[in-house]
Amino acid sequence: MAYPLQLGLQDASSPIMEELTNFHDHTLMIVFLISSLVLYLISLMLTTKLIHTSTMDAQEVETIWTILPAIILILIALPSLRILYMMDEINNPVLTVKTMGHQWYWSYEYTDYEDLCFDSYMTPTNELKPGELRLLEVDNRVVLPMELPIRMLISSEDVLHSWAVPSLGLKTDAIPGRLNQATVTSNRPGVFYGQCSEICGSNHSFMPIVLEMIPLKLFENWSVSMTQ
């Protein structure tokens, strides 16, 4: 959940987001070390009075600054490829939800159930209840079981959209005529907020996403009540 004046990432609520947070810290540490080294070398160059007027080349130095960046790139690429594979791989999902983007709302269809589909519009400010969040609440939340792999099929009916929930590490483009997929898994129950993350027109800022993750038993009761 985001909060005012937040400078860091949202708390990770899924295995993928935990991996992304660790990768962010790993990459940031490498960038910090490189920046410190470069600043140190620049300060030496500005303060030293020693010069080499007779040096034409330095094969050893050139070898080092060719091999060292290659090693650094490998250290960044290997965990990145691992996370990309984790985000793309979906093994035996217990549920499939089809998400369609529209100007300017989302529609959801639970493909494993008959007639379980609905549209999700932003709740206007004058209809908000005490404690609800402005520009983030919707009239129909997406209810899903926690701690289980769920496949989201994402597309669009009109223009480009992007279905994003930061605390779950989700951001998938909704492209007309193309079906993208993403894995949704939550480590704990809760309500998770997101928004359309692709500029899609004048009301782009009014396309919130709300996921409510609950235990499986409660989800079964909810699905029965929605299909009756």
UniProtKB/Swiss-Prot annotation:
It is a multi-pass membrane protein. It catalyses: 4 Fe(II)-[cytochrome c] + O2 + 8 H(+)(in) = 4 Fe(III)-[cytochrome c] + 2 H2O + 4 H(+)(out). Mg(2+) binds at E198. It is an enzyme of class 7 (translocase). Keywords: Copper, Electron transport, Magnesium, Membrane, Metal-binding, Mitochondrion, Mitochondrion inner membrane, Respiratory chain, Translocase, Transmembrane, Transmembrane helix, Transport. One of its GO terms (molecular function) is cytochrome-c oxidase activity. The chain crosses the membrane at residues 15-45, 60-87. PROSITE patterns: COX2, COX2_CUA, COX2_TM. It is found in: Mitochondrion inner membrane. Cu cation A2 binds at C196, E198, C200, H204. GO terms for cellular component: mitochondrial inner membrane; respiratory chain complex IV. Its EC number is 7.1.1.9. Its cofactor is Cu cation. Its main location: mitochondrion. Belongs to the cytochrome c oxidase subunit 2 family. Component of the cytochrome c oxidase, the last enzyme in the mitochondrial electron transport chain which drives oxidative phosphorylation. The respiratory chain contains 3 multisubunit complexes succinate dehydrogenase (complex II, CII), ubiquinol-cytochrome c oxidoreductase (cytochrome b-c1 complex, complex III, CIII) and cytochrome c oxidase (complex IV, CIV), that cooperate to transfer electrons derived from NADH and succinate to molecular oxygen, creating an electrochemical gradient over the inner membrane that drives transmembrane transport and the ATP synthase. Component of the cytochrome c oxidase (complex IV, CIV), a multisubunit enzyme composed of 14 subunits. The complex is composed of a catalytic core of 3 subunits MT-CO1, MT-CO2 and MT-CO3, encoded in the mitochondrial DNA, and 11 supernumerary subunits COX4I, COX5A, COX5B, COX6A, COX6B, COX6C, COX7A, COX7B, COX7C, COX8 and NDUFA4, which are encoded in the nuclear genome. This is Cytochrome c oxidase subunit 2. It comes from Meriones shawi (Shaw's jird). The lineage of its organism: Eukaryota, Metazoa, Chordata, Craniata, Vertebrata.
